């Protein structure tokens, strides 16, 4: 079985997108500082509701069989009117404190597949690593990518009927904070 078939048949996208809907409508998450917590929980949801394992390694986020998968996700990734099969530019690699260039990132393979989840449009697309690296562009603080029709395979994930968690994550975080600081 390949990764595309795995994504199309063995991921409970109703629950994954239920987690997404819950996190992005949670009024307790109101600042950019909350983005890391939300992204991490979406990764954990994909791990829990599939056989794709979250490993959170440098250069890739998941493993499935012998494949390494880098996940990128965002709201409003695909154009709505201009070209619905094209994405806006999004960051795929960060320079951080490294002295790397976009050309360096084009040469270094750290994953086999780039998995892109469009959170609002509920679309899941996959790009083969070598092709993804050929599309890297210079960004302010890292390598950016913009996908066009033909650059990716769009997974057929069917109609999504989100199943939301019964409680908001921000509430659980508040409870954990209170317990942690209660000494």
Describe each PLM feature range.
Residues 1-183:
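Nucleic-acid endonuclease domains
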């Amino acid at each position: 079985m390949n990764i595309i078939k795995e994504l199309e048949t063995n991921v409970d996208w109703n629950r994954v997108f239920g987690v997404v809907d819950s996190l992005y409508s949670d009024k307790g998450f109101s600042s950019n500082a909350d983005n890391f917590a939300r992204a991490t929980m979406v990764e954990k949801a994909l791990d829990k509701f599939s056989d794709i394992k979250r490993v959170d390694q440098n250069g890739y986020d998941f493993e499935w069989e012998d494949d390494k998968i880098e996940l990128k996700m965002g709201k409003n990734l695909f154009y709505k009117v201009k070209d619905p099969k094209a994405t806006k530019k999004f960051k795929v690699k960060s320079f951080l404190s490294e002295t790397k260039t976009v050309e360096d990132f084009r040469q270094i393979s750290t994953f086999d597949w780039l998995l892109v989840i469009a959170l609002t449009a509920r679309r899941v697309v996959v790009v083969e690593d070598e092709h993804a690296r050929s599309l890297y562009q210079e960004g302010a603080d890292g390598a950016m990518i913009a996908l066009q029709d033909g650059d990716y395979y769009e997974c057929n994930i069917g109609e999504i009927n989100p199943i939301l968690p019964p409680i908001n994550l921000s509430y659980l975080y508040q409870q954990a904070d209170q317990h942690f600081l209660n000494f």
